[in-house]
Amino acid sequence: MKNVYFLSDAHLGSRAIEHGRTQERRLVNFLDSIKHKASAVYLLGDMFDFWYEFRLVVPKGYTRFLGKLSELTDMGVEVHFFTGNHDIWCGDYLSKECGVIIHREALTTEIYGKEFYLAHGDGLGDPDKKFKLLRWMFHSTTLQTLFSAIHPRWSCLLYTSP
């Protein structure tokens, strides 16, 4: 029986994390170390600090991580990607190009005879009003459409400038 792995909140690309490339390499090295032992990997949100996927443009970077996800799925390892509050704007790039299974909602599933409730967790509990407003804004299709109308060159400045 192969193992199932759960990871979350890597926040790849975060300005708050010094040596971001080193962090990505460590994550990739870990995934490489489990690739022959894993039947599935569940990425439970916020793997990226910010991921906004335009129709024809995805954020630059993360090459090693995305390549490793592709390698895992090519080997037959199921990779499940749950959107978190930092990467909810994930479209179909990760599924089409890397073969990952995207989950936008919580999932109850059975793994080796045990039932698991899997979610990122940002919406669990009793959030305050500010959080509810922010969550509504992030999930608003109207606001996403408006943001998508901004050229990626300019919109990326909103989340990459200090």
Question: Model regions: which residues?
Answer:
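Binuclear metal-dependent hydrolase catalytic cores centered on His/Asp/Glu-rich metal-binding motifs
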Residues: 17, 25-28, 121-153
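Short hydrophobic-aromatic micro-motifs
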Residues: 6, 115-119, 125-126
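Conserved small/polar residues in nucleotide/adenosyl-binding loops
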Residues: 159-162
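Core catalytic region of metal-dependent phosphoesterases/phosphodiesterases
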Residues: 2-3, 7, 12-111
